[in-house]
Amino acid sequence: MAKLKKNPTGTIAQNKKARHDYFIEHKFEAGLVLAGWEVKSLRATKVQLVDSYVLLKDGEAWLMGCHITPLKTASTHVIADPTRTRKLLLNKRELEKLTSSVQQKGYACVALSVYWKEHLIKCEIALGKGKKEYDKRHTERERDSDRELQRAVRSKGKDD
């Protein structure tokens, strides 16, 4: 049986909703404490980061709301909890910066992506400020105008 290949880019999953809902100000790279069955599921890209966030408690960071679906071939004597809280590994300096920023009004810490870094699984977390509804509409308008501009440039090149 052939082995499953890792994603060539290294990215396992992304949280696109977080980029839509928050102005991302700072990004951090954190290690994840995982069980064996979770690593196998991540190799098969069976993870969802939508609605996942980082909880800062007692000088530690915890990933909440991340759903890792267990494989059907996983062990039967290990009870797999797909939505359990997973510990994030960060430096003390990074934890202090996150804690002080999250205590300010309007800031949140969310998970952006899970990816491979050599043989380790890392989680990119970000410190962001929540967008209002009009901010989201403004971003969408900008994206649409950029798309229109790109279309115009491409069609002009084809006409020549």
Curated annotation (Swiss-Prot):
CDD domains cross-referenced by the UniProt entry: SmpB
Cell compartment(s), UniProt: Cytoplasm
Superkingdom of origin: Bacteria
Location of the region described as Disordered in the Swiss-Prot/TrEMBL record: 131-160
Signal peptide limits: none
Keyword RNA-binding included in the entry's annotation: yes
Main localisation: cytoplasm
InterPro entries named in the record: SmpB, SsrA-bd_prot, SsrA-bd_prot_CS
Keywords: Cytoplasm, RNA-binding
GO biological process, one term: trans-translation
GO molecular function: RNA binding
An example Gene Ontology CC term for this record: cytosol
PANTHER family per UniProt: SSRA-BINDING PROTEIN (PTHR30308:SF2), TMRNA-BINDING COMPONENT OF TRANS-TRANSLATION TAGGING COMPLEX (PTHR30308)
Assigned protein family: Belongs to the SmpB family.
Protein function: Required for rescue of stalled ribosomes mediated by trans-translation. Binds to transfer-messenger RNA (tmRNA), required for stable association of tmRNA with ribosomes. tmRNA and SmpB together mimic tRNA shape, replacing the anticodon stem-loop with SmpB. tmRNA is encoded by the ssrA gene; the 2 termini fold to resemble tRNA(Ala) and it encodes a 'tag peptide', a short internal open reading frame. During trans-translation Ala-aminoacylated tmRNA acts like a tRNA, entering the A-site of stalled ribosomes, displacing the stalled mRNA.
Name of the protein in question: SsrA-binding protein
UniProt lineage: Bacteria, Pseudomonadati, Pseudomonadota, Gammaproteobacteria, Pseudomonadales
